[in-house]
Regions:
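Short helix-coil transition sites and intra-membrane helix breaks within transmembrane domains
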Residues: 37-43, 74-83, 103, 140-143
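Membrane-embedded helical hairpins/re-entrant loop segments and their flanking transmembrane helices
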Residues: 104, 111-143, 153-158
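Hydrophobic core segments of alpha-helical transmembrane domains in multi-pass membrane transport
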Residues: 6-7, 24-36, 69-74, 107-118, ...
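Transmembrane alpha-helical segments and their short flanking loops
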Residues: 87-95, 131, 139, 143-145, ...
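Hydrophobic alpha-helical segments of integral membrane proteins
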Residues: 10, 14-21, 42-57, 71, ...
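Single conserved hydrophobic/aromatic residue that forms the stacking wall/gate
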Residues: 1-13
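Membrane-interfacial loop-to-helix junctions in multi-pass transporters
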Residues: 17-24, 54-66, 96-100, 196-203
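Hydrophobic alpha-helical transmembrane segments of multi-pass integral membrane proteins
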Residues: 62-98, 102
Length: 225
């Protein structure tokens, strides 16, 4: 019996070392090698190309780009399209192109904010669980955590995605139109003190959030109880 207990403890120790140390370490090494060998070179070339393109973009073309980046942030809620838009915004920060980061941040905040507001305005369109999560969803939106919209999108992907993309694209457009700028890659409303034209950014958020909420109210039908 004691021998069995000792073997079980040894197996537990080995398993804990394997899962707590070896697997994370090997995963980190793999990702590091992958970044250095496969991802960084093309990303560096993309960075150089993007810098050249941004230098030549003025007026209407920047409005289009801001709209596109805002909409991309709401396309897959933290997936590859979302991350591509986010990387574009962070790369623009290197050249002090703060307006695009503002469009990206506004676009990423709109889905949770719009869904949270829709839960409050149109409670019959959502389940009791979704309504209870509305405050948390609003908080995630305020802090630029786009993934807060994911549970709602999984339940009703078409309607939620259409509403979120429309609101986010509109918010991205307005941030460029009003000359907003964001000098940091993350933070949401906590970055308002360091933003360029904070009132304009709040206007973009308000319009985008309301657009998404109203579209959800129109697209989603009341649930049958």
């Amino acid at each position: 019996l004691h021998l069995c207990d000792r073997r079980q403890r040894q197996m537990c120790i080995r398993d804990s070392i394997k899962t707590g140390l070896l697997v994370p370490l090997l995963s980190l090494l793999f990702v590091g090698v992958l970044m250095v060998m496969a991802i960084n070179p093309p990303l560096g070339r993309f960075n150089a190309w993007l810098s050249i393109q941004l230098d030549g973009m003025q007026g209407g073309s920047r409005l289009v780009l801001g709209t596109l980046l805002g909409g991309m942030m709401a396309t897959d809620y933290g997936g590859p399209i979302n991350k591509a838009a986010y990387v574009s915004g962070t790369l623009a920060l290197v050249d002090q192109q703060y307006d695009l980061m503002a469009a990206v941040m506004a676009g990423g905040m709109i889905p949770p904010l719009g869904i949270g507001l829709a839960c409050l305005l149109f409670p019959t369109r959502f389940t009791s669980t979704e309504r209870c999560s509305a405050p948390q969803t609003l908080l995630m939106g305020a802090t630029f955590v786009t993934e807060g919209a994911l549970p709602f999108a999984l339940r009703d992907p078409l309607r939620v995605s259409l509403a979120c993309i429309a609101g986010s694209a509109l918010a991205g457009f307005i941030t460029i139109l009003l000359g907003c700028g964001c000098p940091a890659p993350h933070g949401g409303l906590f970055l308002l003190p360091v933003m360029e034209n904070p009132p304009g950014f709040l206007i973009a958020l308000a319009v985008g959030t309301l657009t998404t909420a109203l579209l959800l109210g129109m697209l989603k039908k009341p649930l049958k109880h």
